[in-house]
């Protein structure tokens, strides 16, 4: 009966979401696939059951690698005996092991079908998920603008106007003492806009270089913490490369990157308690990437948040329900949709109940690769999410340092997320579906006291002319003026023409009279 009920609940899940679950047989763990993603053949992520300890996990890892190697040897020997042609079916075995602050334990690897079937039947295994491709969430480059309007927008309550378009209201030390893990394609750490505050954390894809060969991660990092382009201008960026230079990678590598960020954060907490780091105030993270629904990635992000990292993730660029994508569906993170200069939901932005907040994401200028001065303007929820990751760092920095005599209890990610939402601007955007929170991120408008910002609470947007509406209004006034002046001029021209015609007619009459006399 227990197995039948489990099968029923999983079947229901498969029909209600883009996650497909293979049929369960002999009490084997299910294999989960994302129907809206491209799978990586014969690559899997495995999640342990909650009872598994570190020692049990280590024993299991040894067992699975031994099983893999014996299976490979046996198949090779069988092929030799049968004189079958050699085929390229070499499997690499164990790739990653996971332990994200005890909240997610498991591993990933490249296994053949026989091995994965035995893994499924192991009593320590809860589920098996097919690995899938993950990609950045940006769109094509746009013409560069002279100023980052997104910064101005998150520091003003009402729609931007000519008077506020280039004005970013902020606290000078915003972000100081906070580490921001940008889990992406890497970061151009030598860019001048980082002022030496960016460093390389870890490269996850095997054999890849410690550099951003794509630009996407650098752009996100600049929006988080750049001197000119960043929300939190004193934060420290930690580059975590999980995607290759083409902007894509594997879900299993992304999970490993999340684990690195969590472990690194906990290490900083530990050395701060030992007095080896001064002024540390906490960590945030940004993931402007996505793929199909992945319960393991969502679990990884939730575990990292439980470990103390304040996570911002992009909602996605498919103009669809963000709950069908990961990590957008991770409930502990802050899921961010994209808005436009005209205070609209960006046409590409995902929506739905998994969205927590909106931030600027169309035509965003920030740092780039190619030189230490390079900039680029691109669009996507990838550009919206780092506004919020930077804002989380900004708000964290307004607290006393953990080693300060004035230190207070840490603001948990859950509490800061709730505060971020509570102070946001309500009803600012148009074209937001009814099942989606219509709130726009706000940084406090330059206020440096965190409690004072929170006490201000939310703000109901009032419709004031946007900058585009101002342009349209002034154009209409100018048009009317031109029309009025043109009408007056035309009348004068008509009068003059009539006088000229009368004069010419008179002259012609006189000329004909003279001709008749001759």
Curated annotation (Swiss-Prot):
InterPro entries: PCSK9_ProteinaseK-like, Peptidase_S8/S53_dom, Peptidase_S8/S53_dom_sf, Peptidase_S8_His-AS, Peptidase_S8_Ser-AS, Peptidase_S8_subtilisin-like, Peptidase_S8_subtilisin-rel, S8pro/Inhibitor_I9. Its EC number is 3.4.21.-. Glycans are attached at residues 246, 286, 449. The record marks 317 as: Important for catalytic activity. SUPFAM superfamilies: Subtilisin-like. PROSITE patterns: SUBTILASE (PS51892), SUBTILASE_HIS (PS00137), SUBTILASE_SER (PS00138). It is an enzyme of class 3 (hydrolase). Residues 148-454 form the Peptidase S8 domain. Residues 1-16 form the signal peptide. Transmembrane segments: none annotated. This is Subtilisin-like serine protease Cla h 9.0101. It comes from Davidiella tassiana (Mycosphaerella tassiana).
């Amino acid at each position: 009966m227990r197995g039948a009920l489990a099968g029923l609940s999983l079947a229901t899940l498969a029909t209600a979401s883009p996650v497909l679950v293979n049929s369960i047989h002999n009490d084997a763990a299910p294999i989960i696939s994302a129907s809206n993603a491209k799978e990586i053949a014969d690559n899997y992520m495995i999640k342990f059951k909650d009872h598994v300890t570190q020692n049990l996990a280590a024993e299991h890892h040894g067992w699975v690698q031994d099983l893999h190697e014996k299976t490979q040897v046996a198949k090779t020997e069988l092929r030799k005996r049968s004189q079958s042609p050699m085929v390229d079916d070499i499997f690499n075995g164990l790739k990653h092991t996971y332990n994200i602050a005890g909240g997610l334990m498991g591993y990933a690897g490249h296994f053949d079908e026989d091995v994965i079937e035995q893994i499924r039947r192991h009593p320590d295994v809860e589920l098996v998920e097919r690995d899938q491709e993950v990609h950045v969430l940006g769109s094509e480059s746009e013409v560069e603008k002279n100023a980052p309007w997104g910064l101005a927008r998150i520091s003003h309550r009402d729609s931007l106007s000519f008077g506020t378009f280039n004005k970013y209201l902020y606290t000078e030390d915003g972000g100081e003492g906070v580490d921001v893990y940008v889990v992406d394609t890497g970061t151009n750490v030598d860019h001048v806009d980082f002022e030496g505050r960016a460093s390389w954390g870890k490269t996850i894809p095997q054999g890849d270089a410690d550099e951003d060969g794509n630009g996407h991660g650098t752009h996100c990092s600049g929006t988080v913490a750049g001197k000119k382009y960043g929300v939190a201008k004193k934060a420290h960026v930690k580059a975590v490369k999980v995607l290759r230079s083409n902007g894509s990678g594997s879900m299993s590598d992304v999970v490993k990157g999340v684990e690195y960020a969590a472990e690194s954060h906990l290490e900083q907490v530990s050395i701060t308690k030992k007095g080896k780091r001064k002024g540390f105030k906490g960590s945030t993270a940004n993931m402007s990437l996505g793929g199909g629904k992945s319960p393991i990635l969502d679990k990884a992000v939730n575990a990292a948040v439980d470990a103390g990292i304040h996570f911002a993730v992009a909602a996605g660029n498919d103009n669809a329900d963000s709950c069908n994508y990961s990590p957008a569906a991770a409930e502990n993170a802050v899921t961010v949709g994209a808005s436009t200069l005209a205070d609209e939901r960006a046409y590409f932005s995902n929506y739905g109940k998994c969205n927590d907040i909106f931030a600027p994401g169309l035509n965003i200028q920030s740092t780039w690769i190619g030189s230490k001065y390079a900039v680029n303007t691109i669009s996507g929820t990838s550009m919206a999410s780092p506004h919020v990751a930077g804002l989380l760092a900004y708000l964290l920095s307004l607290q006393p340092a953990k080693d300060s005599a004035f230190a207070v209890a840490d603001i948990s990610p859950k509490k800061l997320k709730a505060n971020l939402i509570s102070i946001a601007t309500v009803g600012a955007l148009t074209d937001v579906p009814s099942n989606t929170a219509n709130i726009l991120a706000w940084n406090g408008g330059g206020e440096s006291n965190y409690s004072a910002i929170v006490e201000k609470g939310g703000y109901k947007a009032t419709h004031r002319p946007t900058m585009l509406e101002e342009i349209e209004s002034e154009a209409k006034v100018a048009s009317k003026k031109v029309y009025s002046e043109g009408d007056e001029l035309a009348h004068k021209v008509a009068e003059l023409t009539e006088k000229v015609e009368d004069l010419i007619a008179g002259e012609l009459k006189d000329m004909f009279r003279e001709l008749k006399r001759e």
